[in-house]
Amino acid sequence: MTPGPQAPHLREPAPRALLASASVAVALAAADTYVVVLALTDMMAGVGVGIDALQRATPIISGFLLGYVAVLPLIGRLADLTSRQRVLLSCLAVFVVGSIVTALASDLGVLVAGRVIQGVGGGGLVPATLAIVADLWPADRRGLPLGIVGAVQELGSVLGPLLGALLLAVADWRWIFWLNALAGVVLTAVVVRTGGGMPWRLRAGPLALAVVGLAVLTLALAAPEALTTSVALGGPFVPFGSATSVLLTPIGVLGLVLTSGALLWWLASAREVLRRADLLGAVLIGT
């Protein structure tokens, strides 16, 4: 009998290094909760919102908090059903995407959407990291690593405004989120390294579709206004105000369709996990 294909060999994870990298990711996400406090007026000006319309900018902060809190029970349950490292890396990827969308935002709707995506990714890092601690340490030795995770989360919340002030002193507010994205990419590589390798095989189809979709979305967000608005079918509409949305133009819609297709492809491959009846309960608790 011919033996089946062998699974790729994974190194044993390095518990302390993995805890350190995951804890830094948790601190980064926690810092992002309030990193925008001092940058709020600059961000409003960057997306064409005047200081007299401050109430319209509150979703920049509350949107992040909403995503952060709502995803906690869902990610906690997903971490029970599949690889903890896989969930952690997925949340880091979502956080990076949200940071890039926020950095490229040219109107309030896109900015708020980017912050919500950031919150979803950042909030998911907490239960995923706690699940990793439960896997790597026996019950009688979990007190210290769990305390470290809780401490760095609070430390990140305290340092967020200070880090934002330091960056604003030397750069534009968008660099806050570009550095977030860069830090997320570096932490992803470190988690893969310290966690023993990639916890799954990347499939070429959905990966290529996601890369193309994100590239088109990036072009739509970063392109000159003439490319996204001065074209046929580029109807301007934004539910947040009178500004023109670059996502509701042909190039923006194409990027959304491609990215959504990649997401649906991935969901189809994860249908066994998604079929679990109690997963719906976790979603309802989060909402």
Language model regions located:
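Transmembrane-helix bundle of Major Facilitator Superfamily
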Residues: 2-195
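Hydrophobic transmembrane-helix bundles of small-molecule transporters
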Residues: 174-287
